[in-house]
């Protein structure tokens, strides 16, 4: 299976850094995942990139996906989500998820 043109484009636009080590150790899985998540899923529906990323960030807050949130935040900013929108997503989540999840996301990483 080859990586689709759409998945390649999405990767280069939103994840321009070094590739995940999984591309070396399990390229078949990564192609399957990338073609699904970065082509089939993103090309369904009418959400633009910024709206999709805001929904993803909110979902990651809800499932306490802190590490993945940190990975996807720069991509969300590249997609056009503003820092003010990121803060608003966090603020809105506090009422539903509590403050513990919020405070862990705002701690500096070392």
Residue ranges of predicted features:
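Short, structured motif recognition centered on aromatic/hydrophobic residues
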Residues: 51-60, 89-90
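Internal helix-loop-helix
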Residues: 91-96
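Conserved small/polar residues in nucleotide/adenosyl-binding loops
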Residues: 103-109
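Secretory/endomembrane lumenal or extracellular ectodomains immediately following the signal peptide
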Residues: 1-49
């Amino acid at each position: 299976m080859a990586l689709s043109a759409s998945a390649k484009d999405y990767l280069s636009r939103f994840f321009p850094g070094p590739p995940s080590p999984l591309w070396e150790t399990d390229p078949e899985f990564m192609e399957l995942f990338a073609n699904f998540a970065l082509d089939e899923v993103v090309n369904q529906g009418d959400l633009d990139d910024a709206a999709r990323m805001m929904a993803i960030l909110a979902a990651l807050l809800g499932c306490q996906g802190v590490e993945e949130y940190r990975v996807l935040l720069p991509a969300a900013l590249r997609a056009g989500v503003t820092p003010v929108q990121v803060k608003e997503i966090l603020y809105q989540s506090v009422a539903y998820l509590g403050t513990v999840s919020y405070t862990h996301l705002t701690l500096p990483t070392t």
